UniProtKB/Swiss-Prot annotation:
It comes from Synechococcus sp. (strain JA-3-3Ab). This is Phosphate acyltransferase. Pathway: Lipid metabolism; phospholipid metabolism. Keywords: Cytoplasm, Lipid biosynthesis, Lipid metabolism, Phospholipid biosynthesis, Phospholipid metabolism, Transferase. It catalyses: a fatty acyl-[ACP] + phosphate = an acyl phosphate + holo-[ACP]. Residues 337-354 have a biased composition (Low complexity). The keyword Phosphoprotein does not apply. One of its GO terms (molecular function) is phosphate:acyl-[acyl carrier protein] acyltransferase activity.
């Protein structure tokens, strides 16, 4: 097992990215390909390099503030080279903490879409009251969606829960403003009808915002605009709770004593609500395994992102998606036709990217 890590992407690259990758190599027994400028990586690398750690040179970088399609102008950008490692089967997955839009664009250019997929989706795992995560998708790849896109998200999410999380019959919910089938906008109404009639998934109906973290659903689908807003709100919950407890518990001697007695429990609460534990989000629907983690990721989150990528590769999620989606929804685009040859990746066809979606991708 070998994971390609874009060591140049993220607010704390390359130092924290390398630290997280070294932790993953040590504790997960996984090979790591650190992709980036050798001169930038060198100060943070142990010498000699441990067996299983390699450096793959990439002389260009797509900055956090650059537009997604900057990957076209920078064929030797670290995110492009990372994707090419998977394309050439020199790595089993990619982990990236850089520009989300650029990561998506690089995945489209170098890996292509799976057959039967109109738009790949970013799926994020969130903690729930029942202790098991819920998969929310899309959380930013497609700010505007059609009903068939959400139908495909539901299928991919259900397969992920079966393969990676071991849930035999995942409960799929459609994020909406009410439980009733007749609630919502045109997209929600049309999608509800399609999901009700869709074989192969267990559609459990509409999920209201308050239902997402209860654990009653295993998969919740929505468009990327709503999903990204919900994701960032959910990520703030743990931080807000922790801050309130820090401010209120130490008041007076009783509070200080209670804080000391409750310390193990409070640590457990923080761990359950901490999004760092979930590592990042999977880009589902491209012809390769790609985990997108926060631009603000430090070593711990990079470690968990690599763990997520490793689990997805070990459970053969890509092969399952390739088989299931191609059979269920034939598309004009398939994995063999959609990705440009490696030799021409620096001059891709404009049709290779869904520009209308990527130029507004949410980070």
């Amino acid at each position: 097992m070998r994971i390609a890590v874009d060591a140049m992407g993220g607010d704390y690259a390359p130092e924290e990215i390398i630290k997280g990758a070294l932790l993953a190599h040590r504790y997960l027994q996984v090979g790591i390909a650190l992709v980036g400028r050798p001169d930038a990586l060198e100060p943070f690398l142990p010498r000699p390099l441990p067996p299983g750690i390699t450096v793959v040179p990439a002389e260009e970088v797509v900055g956090m503030a650059e537009e997604p399609l900057a990957v076209r102008r920078k064929p030797q950008a670290s995110i492009n080279v990372s994707m090419q490692q998977v394309r050439a089967k020199q790595a089993d997955a990619v982990v990236a903490a850089g520009n989300t839009g650029a990561t998506m664009a690089a995945a489209y250019l170098n890996l292509g879409r799976l057959a039967g997929i109109d738009r790949p989706a970013i799926g994020a795992l969130l903690p729930t009251l029942k202790g098991k995560p819920v998969l929310l998708l899309d959380v930013g790849a497609n700010v505007d969606c059609r009903p068939r896109f959400l139908e495909q998200f539901a299928r991919m999410g259900s397969l992920y829960c079966q393969c990676v999380l071991g849930i035999e019959k995942p409960r799929v919910g459609l994020l909406n403003i009410g439980e009733e089938p007749n609630k919502g906008n045109d997209l929600a109404l049309a999608t509800h009808q399609r999901l009700t009639q869709l074989p192969g998934i267990h559609f459990a109906g509409n999920a209201e915002g308050r239902d997402v973290l209860t654990g009653d659903f295993d998969v919740v689908v929505c468009d990327g605009f709503v999903g990204n807003a919900l994701l960032k709100f959910a990520e703030s919950v743990g931080q807000v709770i922790t801050q309130v407890l820090r401010e209120e518990l130490p008041r007076g001697w009783r509070g200080k004593l209670g804080c000391w007695l409750l310390q193990p429990n409070l640590k457990q609460v923080k761990r359950r609500m901490d999004y760092v534990e979930y590592g990042g989000a999977l880009l589902l629907g491209v012809n390769g395994i790609c985990v997108i983690t926060h631009g603000s990721s430090k070593a711990a989150m990079v470690y968990h992102a690599i763990r997520l990528a490793k689990e997805a590769a070990e459970q053969k999620i890509l092969q399952r998606l390739q088989a299931e989606m191609a059979d269920s929804h034939p598309s004009k685009v398939n994995a063999g036709e959609n990705a440009p040859p490696l030799a021409s990746a620096s001059n891709p066809s404009p049709e290779a990217l869904p520009v209308g979606s990527l130029d507004r991708v949410e980070g």
